Amino acid sequence: MIKYLKSRLNIIIVKCILGIIILSLVFGTINNYFNRDTTRYIAKVNGEEISFITLQKMYIDERKKQEKILGQDFEKIKKNKKFKEETYNYILSQLINNILLEQYTKRMNFNIQDNEIKKIIFNIPIFQENNEFNKKKYLNYLSSKNLTHYEYVSLIRKKLNTTYLINAISETDFILDNEQKKIIKLLSEKRIIKKAIIKINPIINNQKVTEKEINNYFDQHKNEFYTPEKFKISYIQLKPNKFKIQCSNEEIKNWYKKNIDKYSNQERRQYSIIQTKTKNEALSILSELKKGEDFSKIAKEKSIDPFSSEQGGNIGWITKNFVPNEIKIANLEKIDQISNIIKFNNNFLIIKLNKILPKKYKKISEVSDLIENEIKYQKSLNTYKKLKDKIAIIAKKNINRFDLILKKTNILPKETNWFDKDSVPKELQNPILKKIIFKKGLLDRQKKLKSHSGLIVLNDHQSFLLSIKNFQKKRIKKLKDIKRNIVNKLKYIKAVEKTKNKLKKILFQLKIGNEHILKKENIIFEEYETVSRYDKNPNISVIFAMPHPKEEKNVYTMYQNKNKNFVIALLDKVYNEKFSNEEEKIIIKYLEKNNIDVTFQCFLQNLHRKATILYNKTDNF
């Protein structure tokens, strides 16, 4: 029992997650049966149609799910064309995958027994009354969906076949021993290397750049050299926490009296239980308890609940509002009162009320600071709403008179410094505000401090009124202002090209065994170091792409590191460091789980390759 109470929430969460997975992948096409539309279809999968209505309904459902998950962020992207297209394509691909899986199970003659389907139907909550199957409810449901009993059974069989197929694929999470050994060997590999660093800055400083090269680069890259449009904004910002609000002791007292239930510890009750497998066992125990036998002793000896039995049946303190229904129906109101036998799942309970901690009200002195904050917040919210409504009315009447709005409301505006898209002030870092500022036509850029945005009401009780104080157009920079940048860029390009060509020649000499070139070019290697695939080094893939050294012949490569310097790497030795048994198990487990997804995707890709899928043009979806 106690295990059941503690794990109830986790079970619900797990069931929800599994439900979402199954519904999104397996039961997606159920609307094909409930919304038969033979006039319009979106796609045909091996001759089987996906109706326009099915896709439309699932698209709407998916958008609702997105809104729940994303919350306020959904408003920012819901009209985005790319986002809508991605949602549409995702739904359509899921529907196609569903049909391909159903068709595959049909070809493979997957078959679910009738008695299994009967159990499922009998246990569906919407067909039950008083925890028992209700035939009338079932038939009414079929009638509402325009289905016969046999069609519904066929539909469930088809969906369950698909579910079993997915489960079968997910259970093939093994990796062959030979594959395991290869992967473990690969992951455990270590390499001993030496590096010689050729610094780029001295080479950059030695490069020469002509005026012609500078002019040509400027002409070819003009779009990279411009000053973005810039703004100075004058604005009104309304937020409840910006108002200076006072609160008297009298207000605190009145608030406390009106809301006293908020400032109390809820009643708590302590219960003990005895859980049995059969009703006869429960009756026998209840008879003993009525004769005065010790509840705690019997719970330890005879209760089958593994958690509470060790505590003499005690399941701890429970706040009155959260007492489970199994205990509520016992209707225990007196200390030491014992319930009758209560059916619980397939078992039986006897419950005892041990103690009651009555509701306790906190003193006003304990909660006065909390109440003061609540009053101030409520008053500031009221002040905010009144001022917001006042400004909204004045702004509507004075469309091109930001200055007049300030005068009538007696508000001093805030003003920003110059900013562009990459340096928006913190107060204006809101997608809606940024759109109004930067999108042409939403704010008049000519009527400075006259035109305004109208009152913009954001979430979290925040409002803005914006006006442009000053504006600079986007313009190409003059060559004289960016000449130094171009010179540095060209010097760097030349230095990189020159260094690459030189190092390629050096590597060629090293490859044919001429290691004297290192001394000639004054290339000095650092100390040996050991590297693994897990090192946080952006160039680690280059090191592990080097071939293994053979017959004591050194292997070399080159790359550019994060500091832009060039590196010649010498691979001296390759060896494997043995993992512990525990580490190997963790790696294999991870690979197996990853393998499920890869297997399933490959399976779907194979079904797609063999299928004939025709798409119908959809305008104004």
Swiss-Prot record:
The family database entries (SUPFAM superfamilies) matched by this protein are listed as: FKBP-like, Triger factor/SurA peptide-binding domain-like
Instruction: Provide the topology term for how it sits in the membrane.
Output: Single-pass type II membrane protein
Functional summary from the UniProt entry: Chaperone that functions as a gatekeeper on the periplasmic side of the SecYEG translocon. Facilitates the translocation of precursor proteins across SecYEG by interacting with the translocating substrate. Also plays a role in the release of newly synthesized secreted proteins at the periplasmic exit site of the Sec translocon.
Which keywords has UniProt assigned to this entry?
Cell inner membrane, Cell membrane, Chaperone, Membrane, Transmembrane, Transmembrane helix
Cysteine disulfide links: none
**Lineage: superkingdom:** Bacteria
Q: Mind telling me which residue stretches traverse the membrane in this protein? A: 11-31
Indicate the principal place this protein occupies in or around the cell.
membrane
Q: Which GO terms describe its molecular function?
A: peptidyl-prolyl cis-trans isomerase activity
NCBIfam families from the xrefs?
A: PRK10788.1
Q: Where does the record place it?
A: Cell inner membrane
Name of this protein? Periplasmic chaperone PpiD
Which family is this protein grouped under? Belongs to the PpiD chaperone family.
Membrane topology, Cytoplasmic segments? 1-10
- The residues exposed to the Periplasmic compartment are 32-621
